[in-house]
Design a protein with these regions (language model features):
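Binding-site signature for planar aromatic cofactors or substrates
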Residues: 1-177
Length: 177
């Protein structure tokens, strides 16, 4: 276990297209979430700091809200094909005016995490999976992201922010996602 991100850690993190994130609210209630993007969407900025975008989601902002209040975070990066994983724990900050926002199309916020613990995790029970296809909902610079159909449901309209892409009638809506 170490408190800095070395070159091997950097290469592993920046090659990932997803990770799991754990946070807690001010009452200590845990939340976990999956975050996905194109490989490299998590950036290692220096030996102590990583950054990643938060895209639109279900409108509940549980991850962002928890990071803004308790700041503690646990991240789990997994390479399912190579059967390797690592953990990074740290202290997070969330910003809607971070200069990195310009580098991530459609990102709403940037999370920066200052690493307190970085360590490999036992790969013994990792099931081998093969990537079939990347999600078409991951924002890309060259095209507008379609809206998942679930965002058109009645319950979603109650929680989605006014500026959510689902509220734009000109956006393409597709059934999966």
């Amino acid at each position: 276990m170490h408190d800095q991100i070395d070159d091997g850690d950097r290469a592993f993190i920046e090659a990932r297209d997803m990770f799991f994130i754990a946070t807690t609210d001010e009452d200590g209630q845990p939340q976990s979430s999956y975050k996905g993007g194109e490989p490299g969407f998590v950036r290692v900025l220096d030996e102590k700091t990583i950054a990643f975008p938060l895209y639109d989601g279900n409108g509940m902002y549980l991850t962002a809200g928890n990071l803004m209040t308790t700041k503690k975070v646990g991240l789990l990066f997994i390479d399912f094909e190579g059967r390797k994983r690592m953990r990074l724990n740290g202290v997070a900050s969330v910003a809607d005016d971070d200069p990195l926002l310009a580098e991530f199309p459609e990102a709403q916020l940037i999370v920066r995490v200052s690493a307190t613990e970085v360590f490999p995790n036992c790969p013994r029970y990792i099931h081998e999976y093969k990537l079939v296809k990347r999600s078409r909902f991951v924002p890309k610079r060259e095209c507008e992201t379609p809206v998942p159909q679930w965002k058109q449901s009645e319950w979603a309209h109650d929680v989605l922010p006014e500026n959510d892409p689902a509220n734009d009638p000109s956006r393409e809506v597709i059934p999966r996602g």
